[in-house]
Amino acid sequence: MDFRIADTFTGSLARLTGDEQKAVKTTAFDLQMNPANPGMSFHKLDKAKDKNFWSVRVSADIRIIVHKTAGSLLLCYVNHHDKAYDWAERRKLETHPKTGAAQLVEIRETVQQILVPQYVLEEPKKVAAPKKRPFAHLSDDDLLSYGVPIEWLKDVREATEESYLALADHLPAEASEALLEITTGGTPRKPEPAEPKANPFDHPDAQRRFRVMTNVEELERALDAPWEKWTVFLHPDQKQ
């Protein structure tokens, strides 16, 4: 079984207290050594759209969210019980249909409001010019090539220069970065589509977010280093 960690796991781990982090790391090491250990308390998340999401008990209130299949265990997120469950219920792990990369996608229907509200203090003297929509000219194929999930295509195309930053927080990193480049006048490089039977975790974009941990030493370095998002999740094109 492949044992992986996601950048969302290390990011959420860093926001816990020191004692909570120690307990989480101990549980993570135990999961890596033997995820089938009867002492591990797995709970299936019935409300999650992704039926492979489970929670693992760390303490009375701390839960690790894992994505578990027959051949893979991925540490996705950690937080206090209710916040951890809420995170999992709003996301799913999927393979992007165009790029072939594994992505943790925020489920569109769970996001009630994206646009930042604009409050008008007084009536404008003139009719305001239509807001620019920097992505309206892009085809579905273009947006998919940049890693935009299918369910977010409509929101991206309707986004304005003002609302884009709020929208970007809900998109996978490679998609938000490509769109940002477009707003600054650039043309992002479109990655080569993966082979049909390729492992979605091997895609260069996925390698930025998910890493296989082959031994305890690797996992310890990934969880302890304050610069883990730069060293462990470095984009393959940037490696020296």
Where are these regions (language model features)?
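N-terminal "first-domain core" detector
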Residues: M1-I5, F42
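Interdomain "pre-motor" coupling segment immediately N-terminal to P-loop NTPase/helicase cores
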Residues: L153-N215
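Enriched for short, Lys/Arg-rich terminal
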Residues: V58-T160, Y164-L167, A194
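A short, surface-exposed loop/turn module that caps and links secondary-structure elements
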Residues: F29-V56
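N-terminal pre-P-loop "Q-motif" helix
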Residues: T214-N215, P226-Q240
